Amino acid sequence: MKQFYTLLLMVFVSIGCTTDKQLTSYVNPLLGTATLWEPEDLGYVRTWKNRTWGAEVFPGASLPNAMVQLSPVTQFRSGAGYQYEDTVIYGFAHTNKGHWNLLHLPMLPATGEISASDYASGYSHLNESARPGYYQVFLEKYGINAELTSTLRCGYHRYTFPKGVEKKLIADMTRTNNRVKDWNIQQEEEYVFTGFQDTDGKIYFYAVSNYPIKDIRQVKDDKHEISLVYFGESRKNEPLELKIGFSFVSVKNAKMNLDKEMIHKDFTQVAKEADKTWEELLSHIKVTGGTTREKGIFYSTLYRSFLWPALRSDVNGDFTDERGNVVNEGFRYYTNPSFWDDYRNKLVLLGMISPDVTTDIIKSITDKGEKRGGYMPTFFHGDHASVFVAGSWLRGITGFDLERAYKLLLKNATVPGQGGRPYLDEYLKRGWIAEKDTTHVPTWDEYKAAVTKTVEYAYDDYATALIAKELGDQENHDLLMRHSGNYKNLFDPSTGFFRGKIETGSWIADFDPYYPYFAYMYREANAWNSLFFAPHDPEGMIALYPDHKAVEQKLDSLFTEPWRGYEAHNMTGFIGNYCHGNQPSHSIPYTYYFIGKQEKAQCVLDSIMGRFYDMGEEKLAYAGMDDAGEMSAWYVLNAIGLYTYSPADPEYIVSVPLFDKVTFTLGDNTTFTILKEGNGKKIRQIRYDGDVINGWFVTHDQLKKGRELVITTAE
């Protein structure tokens, strides 16, 4: 009988092995954490003392668009706090984006004598692991195995100490990635400590330990100060566990979040639930074919696309608004998107899979705009909330007040003022923004990035015009559509580049299309990187050149003229002068489509996907910053053969997928399929639901019908 049961168990195991592999198992949260060092990857020989920017992503535990990102800190004042090549860990912080901010409440378990300025622990990547919703590392200095998992608003720490040692916890309350204005940590109950950190607003925490708290002391030396939590009964051998709730409202709400999400669950349960949440999200896109490497990059980049924006409201709906008031408006409140980056692709991908989150993000930015002078929030550069709102509405995400959002966006586009578009008065007066005339190499933010602003404002005006049309505002629609042609005002036909002008209207004389300006004429780009940006009007853009042959020659030169060895902030990963390590170039390859050379575009797209997402010695580096998921979403969409060439428009340019079959389930549970026929780079035919598509675009409404998109290729 025993042999029978053993045989039966083997059968069940065998059956289990034939089931589909979990998609979370393809995800490597460490992908993107390494930095590029070699000249062939960077595009130049490094001379700066500081390391170049990597993808600036974190490997720790989080849920999709959560409040908590619980992740190791290897260096403060770095992009995401974690760099793969670093050798020590300072703590595990609870918020993260990857933009040199956040990293709230870093904590580290410890034992023995502890120095306030020298407490970081060494670690080895051989004893480090990560998967969606879970992170583990062995802290060599203290002999402690650290494990982390999380819910939306709570972090769970499990620390396994050496047997018989005294357990302590370092809380580095004076550190985040920003300046800490104020902080507090105190014992609340026998097993509870609470507090806050104040950087650009307060984040509160409520922490529950499975060991009684004996004392909380401040330890300082001439360099630094830390808080040290001592635990009673701490020589017992059970792991030290901490369940920590967070809130941007109050300690009371942090406790409420903890009680709702985590307090009655153990570590294994929380980690399993996190894995399940990610599995459900990743399962929206299932792929067949491709290599194991391609699937690994695909699901890792899909995972990475859903970590930002971050939740800022509590389980009861409370949040702290732009005026510092605690309010409850009946929606989940989120941080602003990283608009200069992710409007291009990631925010569309977010809406395709999580339209409910998109709806609440738009409600959030509208609430902020109404309370900050009547302007819709912008981010860093450009005014791309217009693209996000228009593209979301036209794709059927209509659960927000479009008129309220439009009122803000129209003010952004037409009324100069603090909080609106920089240099809008110039743009409205002339149709372009003037730049200073100089013969000196400019640096950083002394200049206007006038070319980039002008061409981007033109596209933003187009997006706002689409909303005006939806609302029947014909007068402003016509005005904004006229403004959408302003990109032409800075096109220099004598050079074939967008080029800066001075106040008089003359072209800037000292013009070098190869030089990578940081903020002079172009934003983090040179003239080559800035070519062909008119996603709303590619035919009009192309018509600025003498003929299609001239456009083809310009494109060919872009991808073959070698980068001239300049060291530039945020510019790495080159094909000729095309830079994939930063966003401005990301739509350029598709220009080939509009001159009848789609196959040339595909050669470039395949090269980008093949080269720039697992670079470096460890195969863990991106070509450049992920910028809150934009770089990742670029890969996801191109890998399935649908790209958001003009994200304001509800359509996708079709390319050759990496995979033979893609099954995509939208957020409304409609499923469409993408099939690739042949292995060539030239698209011979595109069919949807059996009908041939004339042109290169498939609409969102077509995809919502849940049919087959068949892409037939030829060599």
Identify the residue ranges that each predicted region occupies.
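Surface-exposed interfaces of beta-sheet-rich extracellular modules
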Residues: 676-690
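Accessory carbohydrate-recognition regions in carbohydrate-active enzymes
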Residues: 19-347, 351-387, 394-455, 468-489, ...
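Hydrophobic, small-residue-rich alpha-helical packing segments that form membrane-like cores
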Residues: 456-460
